[in-house]
A protein has these predicted regions:
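Active-/binding-site microenvironments in catalytic and ligand-binding cores
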Residues: 1-201
């Protein structure tokens, strides 16, 4: 007979993961409290890759979101929003993906990657009812953020965010269902998440 067993260790916020709202806002949902119906929903890909190509500090705007709505004739309600910056293609080159190969506090000032503008986050929580938001960069706030307003704005309203989401370049802008199932860590502020897309027939 044959037997294999391994041990693994991981931070809550490494690799492809989901932030529970408690990560940046007190008394909000923890990882094990996220309802399943929020984690399985139609997907909407907002493609800003052309804008990010020459601007690693690009922040997704309200206009980017409303342009998707105008093109597809529907509002961003009851969907999982996925921001395609194109930065996923740079992984695992840390310099291209994050702006620096350094780690820890010394790296913070050198981080450069796109994110969601706080004004766009505020517009979403005020005017739309999205389930989850995700993107193909290390953080929902852009790399040069010092106050993490996008995190705070979303998480205050119990809207989780997925970071380091892979293969967004393989998805259409609509016409699929996202299934995002995180490791169910009791009391977790986040954790690894397996994200799959099922194409509509």
């Amino acid at each position: 007979w044959f037997y294999t067993a391994n041990r693994f260790w991981t931070p809550e916020h490494g690799g492809t993961h989901i932030d529970a709202p408690i990560h940046f806002f007190k008394d909000r949902e923890r990882l094990d409290e996220l309802p399943l119906e929020r984690l399985i929903a139609p997907g909407a890909v907002i493609d800003v890759s052309a804008k990010c190509e020459g601007n690693a500090d690009y922040q997704v705007t309200v206009d980017d979101l409303t342009a998707w709505e105008s093109e597809h004739g529907q509002q961003l309600n009851d969907v999982i929003v996925l921001l395609r910056t194109g930065f996923g293609k740079h992984w695992p080159d840390r310099v291209k993906y994050m702006g620096t190969n350094e780690r820890g506090e010394a790296a913070v000032a050198k981080l450069h990657f796109p994110g969601l503008h706080p004004d766009a986050a505020r517009w979403l929580v005020t005017n739309r009812k999205i389930k989850v938001i995700g993107l193909d960069t290390p953080s929902i706030d852009y790399g040069q953020s010092k106050d993490f307003k996008t995190h705070v704005t979303l998480y205050e309203q119990n809207i989780p965010a997925m970071e380091n989401v892979a293969n967004l370049d393989q998805l259409p802008e609509k016409g699929f269902t996202v299934i995002a199932l995180p490791m169910k860590i009791k009391g977790g502020s986040g954790g690894p998440v397996r994200v799959v897309a099922v194409m509509d027939q």
